């Protein structure tokens, strides 16, 4: 869509629109007085999952009392306007997080929820989306209906196979709202926009929103291995993420400090503080209802301390017999067997199409001469891949084998960027996506190296997107302002963006919470600390261009929408 046709959140006006506004000045002032007289104030915002009968009815009740419906617009205790028609100024674009990408302004009263209004769906597969928004706005969920009534909120699929499956169109016109999309996710995102409009302004402006995300992977990652997080806290984050149009939550649940989910295949490795499978299933179900994919991560061959604690015979040892913390001996078949047991088991618990294999910081590779320091690994590499094979080759083969395990469950694998090596005879499989997090390590490869190989990349840039509890080493807590003003998905390493020609290979990004010093913050403090970084991150993933709102305006908007 050409830029001159867009009406964005910043309220940019064309010269023609300004002229029209001047010509309608007198009528607009009169109309403004009428609108002000019938303004809505929503006192309580629904926070339940919504089934059409929740406490969200308070919102509709408030709208009823303040003239929310068309029928009530001319009442509220005073005589009707003597004018037979009402003139409205052109509507302003809604203000939401993330910002809608296009709004076509129209003249009209907009739409407010009222107790008499219905939510109807044109397709039964949209029942979950319909019930949720009905409960949140205090409307009646009427199910699948063909008739049209005043005040209806209608959800429908348009079956446009060529469109972005997460795109949607929301039309506010004639006292009704229609959300139309090629897929269920797009319909859901349209309802999130509507919910924010009502929350922030009391009404949805007349006109048409056409919206879609720029990036397909919009994520948040949680290190729940180093610090145990309650199921309720994770569920609250999923609701927050859904309202912000995120579509991934990564759960890093295995590391040196703990293994945090119940296991049937290897119960001996599970930490005392952990989530049951029933709790995880509830989390996964809630995420699915918000169109969020849960991306599990069992990191290997490093960061396996909790597994090794129960299986010390699998711990990697150097040439002097010294144990290497967190590193499993990948020359032993038993090591592959136990990790594959876990990957196969948890593939049944996490049905989403993505899987994180880790692959970072294998301690056998941080020494100057891995072959001399770990002769057992060097011998295994030569035996498997031939003379001249290295420990890096053996480690790459391990990554490929684990990728094959999850690929058998129709999962797309990803791994941390320091698990991919240059100049090896064994190459990482082409479909393993690169989770780029750091370039600070000696010899770290530039992002362009992966991209020039044709690899797809997800941005976890630790310069902007790492929230590390206790701020160890050189880490500092990220700020929403810095992300909002300085970062975009092409800024993969440090503060420099890669070439625009790689844009399509960069699938998106993820804000990551790491719990290196787990007692540094409580759950409540973590939630507060990531609040604005989450909002800034999703804004730049939805639309990487420079935002129309200043940071202070964006922060104020976030306060109104919470």
List each language-model region with its residue ranges.
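Acidic, contiguous N-terminal accessory segments
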Residues: 2-185, 193-194, 204-205, 415-420
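Conserved, mostly hydrophobic/aromatic
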Residues: 119, 183, 220, 241, ...
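Soluble non-cytosolic domains of exported or imported proteins
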Residues: 124-128, 185, 228-232, 274, ...
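Feature activates predominantly on carbohydrate-active enzymes
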Residues: 165-336, 344-354, 370, 517
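Structural preference for beta-strand elements that scaffold enzyme active sites
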Residues: 217-221, 248-250, 291-295, 354-356, ...
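Active-site beta-loop-alpha junctions enriched in small/polar residues
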Residues: 225, 254-258, 297-303, 360-362, ...
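Active-site neighborhood of glycoside hydrolase catalytic domains
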Residues: 325-431, 437, 442-447
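Flexible, acidic glycine-rich loops studded with aromatic residues
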Residues: 413-418, 427-562
């Amino acid at each position: 869509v050409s830029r001159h046709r867009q009406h964005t959140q910043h309220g940019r006006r064309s010269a023609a629109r300004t002229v029209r506004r001047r010509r309608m000045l007198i009528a607009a002032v009169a109309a403004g007085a009428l609108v002000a007289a019938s303004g809505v104030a929503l006192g309580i915002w629904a926070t339940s999952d919504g089934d059409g009968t929740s406490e969200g009815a308070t919102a509709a009740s408030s709208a009823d009392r303040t003239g929310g419906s068309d029928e009530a617009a001319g009442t509220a205790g005073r005589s009707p306007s003597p004018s037979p028609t009402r003139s409205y100024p052109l509507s302003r674009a809604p203000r939401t997080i993330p910002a809608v990408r296009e709004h076509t302004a129209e003249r009209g009263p907009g739409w407010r929820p009222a107790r008499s209004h219905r939510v109807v769906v044109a397709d039964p597969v949209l029942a979950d989306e319909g019930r949720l928004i009905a409960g949140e706005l205090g409307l009646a969920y009427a199910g699948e209906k063909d008739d049209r009534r005043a005040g209806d909120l209608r959800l429908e699929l348009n079956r446009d196979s060529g469109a972005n499956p997460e795109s949607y169109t929301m039309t506010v016109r004639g006292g009704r709202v229609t959300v139309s999309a090629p897929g269920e996710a797009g319909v859901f995102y349209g309802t999130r926009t509507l919910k924010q409009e009502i929350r922030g302004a009391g009404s949805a402006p007349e006109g048409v929103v056409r919206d879609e995300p720029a990036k397909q992977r919009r994520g948040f990652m949680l290190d729940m291995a180093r610090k145990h997080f309650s199921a309720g806290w994770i569920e609250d984050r999923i609701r927050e993420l859904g309202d912000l149009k995120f579509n991934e939550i990564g759960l890093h649940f295995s590391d040196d400090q703990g293994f945090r989910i119940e296991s049937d295949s290897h119960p001996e490795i599970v930490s005392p503080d952990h989530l049951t499978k029933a709790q995880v299933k509830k989390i996964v179900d809630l995420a699915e209802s918000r169109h969020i994919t849960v991306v599990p991560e069992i990191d290997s061959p490093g960061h396996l301390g909790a597994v090794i604690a129960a299986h010390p015979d699998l711990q990697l040892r150097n040439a002097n017999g010294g144990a290497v913390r967190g590193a499993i001996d990948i020359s032993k078949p038993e090591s592959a067997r136990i990790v594959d047991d876990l990957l196969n088991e948890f593939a049944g618990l996490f049905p989403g199409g993505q899987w994180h294999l880790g692959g970072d910081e294998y301690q056998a590779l941080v020494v100057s001469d891995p072959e001399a320091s770990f002769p057992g690994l060097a011998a295994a590499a030569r035996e498997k891949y031939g003379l001249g094979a290295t420990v890096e080759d053996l480690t790459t083969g391990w990554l490929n084998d684990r990728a094959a395990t999850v690929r058998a469950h129709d999962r797309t694998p990803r791994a941390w960027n320091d698990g991919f090596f240059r100049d090896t005879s064994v190459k990482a499989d082409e479909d393993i996506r690169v989770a780029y997090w750091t370039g600070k390590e000696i010899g770290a490869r530039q992002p362009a190296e992966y991209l020039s190989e044709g690899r797809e990349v997800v941005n976890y840039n630790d310069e902007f997107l790492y929230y590390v509890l206790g701020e160890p080493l050189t880490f500092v807590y990220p700020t929403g302002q810095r992300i909002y003003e300085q970062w975009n998905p092409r800024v993969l390493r440090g503060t420099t963006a890669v070439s625009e020609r790689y844009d399509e290979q960069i699938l998106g990004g993820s804000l990551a919470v790491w719990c290196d010093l787990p007692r540094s913050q409580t759950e409540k403090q973590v939630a507060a600390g990531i609040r604005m970084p989450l909002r800034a991150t999703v804004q730049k993933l939805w639309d990487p261009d420079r935002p129309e709102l200043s940071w202070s305006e964006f922060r104020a908007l976030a306060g109104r929408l919470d």
